[in-house]
């Protein structure tokens, strides 16, 4: 058996991998208006200019932690696809129980 894992059951040698865009500086995709809308939802009236970069940094750390845990659950289950339940369990592990996504 060639070392193609669980998914490689077809014939041939496995084609070329698709090109994947290099991800960099995507945190800037969290725009100033988006942060402002989140703050408004939280009841904030005025926002300091320094808040935007700080918010991006905090959000990045939070998402890195949640995604790391979710991927750990996925790998333990020997899957390659992260499911909604993986994310729910990852959030629960961090003390942020999320309802409405199964389980």
Curated annotation (Swiss-Prot):
N6-(beta-hydroxybutyryl)lysine: residues bearing it: 9, 13, 32, 78, 92
Species classification: Eukaryota, Metazoa, Chordata, Craniata, Vertebrata
N6-lactoyllysine: modified positions: 6, 9, 13, 17, 32, 78, 92
Effect of residue 41 to H: Found in a patient with a neurodevelopmental disorder; uncertain significance; results in early developmental defects when expressed in zebrafish embryos
Positions where N6-propionyllysine occurs in the chain: 9, 17, 32, 45, 78, 80, 92
Modified residues (Symmetric dimethylarginine): 4
Functional description taken from the UniProt entry: Core component of nucleosome. Nucleosomes wrap and compact DNA into chromatin, limiting DNA accessibility to the cellular machineries which require DNA as a template. Histones thereby play a central role in transcription regulation, DNA repair, DNA replication and chromosomal stability. DNA accessibility is regulated via a complex set of post-translational modifications of histones, also called histone code, and nucleosome remodeling.
Protein known as: Histone H4
Biased composition (Gly residues): 1-14
Phosphotyrosine: residues bearing it: 52, 89
Subunit text: The nucleosome is a histone octamer containing two molecules each of H2A, H2B, H3 and H4 assembled in one H3-H4 heterotetramer and two H2A-H2B heterodimers. The octamer wraps approximately 147 bp of DNA. Found in a co-chaperone complex with DNJC9, MCM2 and histone H3.3-H4 dimers. Within the complex, interacts with DNJC9 (via C-terminus); the interaction is direct. Interacts with NASP; NASP is a histone chaperone that stabilizes and maintains a soluble pool of Histone H3-H4 dimers.
Organism name: Homo sapiens (Human)
Post-translational modification as stated in the protein's UniProt record: Acetylation at Lys-6 (H4K5ac), Lys-9 (H4K8ac), Lys-13 (H4K12ac) and Lys-17 (H4K16ac) occurs in coding regions of the genome but not in heterochromatin. Acetylated as part of spermatogenesis progression prior to histone-to-protamine exchange. Citrullination at Arg-4 (H4R3ci) by PADI4 impairs methylation.
Modification type N6-methyllysine: residues: 13, 21
Residues modified to N6,N6,N6-trimethyllysine: 21
Modification N6,N6-dimethyllysine occurs at: 21
N6-acetyllysine: modified positions: 6, 9, 13, 17, 32, 92
């Amino acid at each position: 058996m060639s070392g193609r894992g669980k998914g490689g059951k077809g014939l041939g040698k496995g084609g070329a991998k698709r090109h994947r865009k290099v991800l960099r500086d995507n945190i800037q995709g969290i725009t100033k208006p988006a942060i402002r809308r989140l703050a408004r939802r939280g009841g904030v009236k005025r926002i300091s200019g320094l808040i935007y970069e700080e918010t991006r940094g905090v959000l990045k750390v939070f998402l890195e932690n949640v995604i790391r845990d979710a991927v750990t659950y996925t790998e333990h289950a020997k899957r390659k696809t992260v499911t909604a339940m993986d994310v729910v369990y990852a959030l629960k592990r961090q003390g942020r129980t999320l309802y409405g996504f199964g389980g």
